[in-house]
Amino acid sequence: MKPEEFKQNVKDRVRVFEDGGIRLLKKGKRGIIRAIFGRTGLVLALFFVQVLLLLSVFRWFTALVPHLLGGSIAFTAVMVIYLLNSDMDNSAKITWLVVIALVPVLGVVLFWWTKGEVGHRMLKRRLKQLAQDTQEQLPQDAQTLERLKAQESGAASLAYYLRGKGGGFPVYENTAVTYFPSGEAKFAELLRQLEKAKQYIFLEYFIIDEGLMWGRVLEVLARKAAEGVHVRVMYDGTCEFTTLPRDYPKRLERLGITCKVFSPLMPFVSTHYNYRDHRKVLVIDGKVGFTGGVNLADEYINHVEKFGRWKDAAVMLEGEAVRSLTAIFLQMWDIAREPEFEAYLKQPIPAPAEAKGFAAPYGDCPLDGERVGELVYIDLLNRARKYIHIMTPYLILDGELETALKFAAERGVDVHLILPGKPDKRIPYALAKTHYAALIRSGVKISEWVPGFVHAKVFVVDDREAVVGTINLDYRSLYHHFEDAVWMVDAPCIPAIEDDFQRTLTQCRAVEATKQSIWQGQTLLRLTGRLVKAIAPLL
């Protein structure tokens, strides 16, 4: 169906714009104001009422503490001993010890409330079963693993982990990987690939916001749905508070698009809301897949400016490795239904002519006890010999990752991080800077991108390995979010990733291990970072 013909057919259901895109929302019917005065506002109001009621109960209970002081002290002492002997990250232990010391009763209750998995036990069991199903449906080709082992034994060990406890994701050959150094570059290719869809299109994104980017994508999706292509869209429930109305899935369904919202906002206090779907996955016919840092909103393609220029990165896969991206999408889509792996993962995928090297897309689930994203990063740091170059928007490190960064630099590896010169959030920006001095003194190089905000999540190592995905260097990504990434070995695109790092570096300010260089006279920011660092794992 031609675009002009399609727009004529749906003009009574959408607004058509000169940029070629379509919109479902009227101007002004979005954002924080809409959320406050709409159904989402009611949900939040009920949520805060519950919080106030819980705090009232805590206050009443705390009033009894003087009468039960001996028991309270003993209970707190038991909690301290429990924390010190737990397998929790040391930074998280310190945080909880601080909280319990400041508010003993409330702190203990909060700890057990979060540890008790209130609201997501069933989800945890379901995801565990889906992970087992994924491993059965994605067999590892033994010859591929042997060839990887012959080229790089350390990389083969990482592949073994990803195939096993890392979620059941194999390493593939017969896959071409294209690297995009900006959201604009990804957007242009994404539109071209969407036009080729014949069977299905799967989209899973953390953020969707109406504007030029989503409008152009939505026009193609709706047109393809009218042609009989099966289109599925899934986005994180936080969009209901920030960008989209609660009835947006129904609006998409009127265009023939099936839509789900991950963890929508509900008026119940639960730790379940702490786990967000931060993934950015697009799969077309099981043959082409995209992932990376780029969401479907205009700031990601610099059509609007929020924090100066926006620097991002993404990759496109063509070939066998797309199977894993398809599985990652289906894991989330099929949480409440029978999995559809058989229907979508058994189709033959032709190998692109230019396919070389190895690729392993993988997901990270915060509920399986495996910190896959962090362990992959640490493994790359430990195996680096010449250099490891990193782009990340945030730097809120636990002890293990900070030690790995320092140790790599102390071994003589060129460890270089590029972070934003203009932050999107002040508190994470302040927390990042609290790590600078210790890292720099160990030999780690840190640079800040002067033109604006770096949102890319990129590791490139020794001209041989790279990771591009959604996983930030902060607690939320490493512990609390559903994430995904692609690990590559000897892929032809790896020199392009390193070239992008070097080009970005030319617009950066080198940071030195001095108070003036790190904080640039921002005393309030420095105090904020020092104060908040004690509770960083909770942010």
Task: Go through the PLM ranges and name each one.
Residues 391-392, 449, 468-469:
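Thr-Gly-centered strand-to-loop micro-motif
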Residues 403, 429-433:
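Short glycine/threonine-rich loop-to-helix capping motif typified by GTGT followed
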Residues 1-375, 379, 383, 423, ...:
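N-terminal localization/anchoring segments of enzymes in phospholipid and broader phosphate metabolism
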